[in-house]
């Protein structure tokens, strides 16, 4: 496991913290801003707007439970392995692929497929949450603690705390125009979100 840094923070640590911190925030912003909208648009386009609220509620509930459980378990695995970097590097790649799962879903479905799509939305959201909670919430946050000390950790955390603002701007400018609720599919939107993150 990386030892705590003391005093001055190296450029490598700063770069890694900002780079992975921003990528993580972009991914979370895509989930927080578009996943619920995506689900609501699917059911509205399918003539079952009443299902949208149930499905989005289930997505929020199960995603929150998944995030809590995953962070605890993944944090323990990171500590046991004694390494953070593999969990971060490979975890972020997996995170991108799990976001792309949503590209497989159409924007309108038949009555016979409504239950299947509703289930897939919840499952895909949970899978994405497992990847994100492992790589970002558990491994990356622990890596920051490992590579900073009480005397300089505040500076890094302050920089990380403003990244969600930049992530919102990037998602709005880079992706907002690509999302079309009336399209047959929004695969371009979800695929492009992963490209921007990478």
What are these regions, as identified by a protein language model?
Residues 2-65:
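Helix-loop boundary and gating motifs at the non-cytosolic
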Residues 41, 110, 167-196:
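Transmembrane alpha-helix termini and helix-breaking/packing motifs in multi-pass membrane transporters
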Residues 90-115:
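C-terminal ends and interior cores of transmembrane alpha-helices
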Residues 53-78, 97-98, 172:
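Central cavity-lining transmembrane alpha-helices of secondary-active solute carriers
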Residues 50-54, 150-160:
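Loop-to-transmembrane helix entry/capping segments in MFS-fold secondary transporters
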Residues 35, 133-149:
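Intracellular juxtamembrane helix-capping segments at the cytosolic ends
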Residues 79-94:
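Cytoplasmic membrane-interface "Motif A"-like loop-to-helix N-cap segments
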Residues 63-68, 154-180:
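Glycine-rich segments within core transmembrane alpha-helices of 12-TM secondary carriers
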């Amino acid at each position: 496991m990386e030892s705590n840094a003391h005093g001055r923070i190296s450029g490598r640590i700063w770069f890694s913290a900002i780079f992975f911190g921003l990528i993580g925030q972009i991914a979370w912003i895509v989930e927080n801003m578009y996943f619920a909208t995506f689900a609501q648009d699917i059911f509205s386009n399918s003539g079952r707007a009443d299902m949208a609220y149930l499905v989005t509620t289930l997505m929020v509930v199960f995603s929150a439970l998944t995030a809590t459980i995953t962070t605890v378990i993944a944090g323990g695995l990171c500590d046991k392995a004694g390494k953070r970097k593999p969990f971060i590097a490979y975890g972020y790649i997996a995170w991108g692929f799990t976001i792309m799962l949503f590209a497989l879903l159409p924007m309108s479905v038949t009555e016979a497929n409504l239950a299947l799509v509703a289930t897939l939305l919840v499952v895909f959201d949970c899978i994405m949450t497992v990847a994100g909670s492992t790589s970002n919430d558990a491994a990356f946050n622990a890596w920051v603690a490992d590579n900073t000390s009480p005397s300089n950790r505040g500076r890094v955390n302050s920089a990380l705390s403003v990244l969600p603002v930049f992530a919102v701007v990037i998602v709005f400018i880079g992706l907002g125009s690509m999302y079309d609720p009336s399209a047959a599919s929004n695969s371009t939107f979800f695929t492009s979100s992963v490209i921007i993150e990478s």
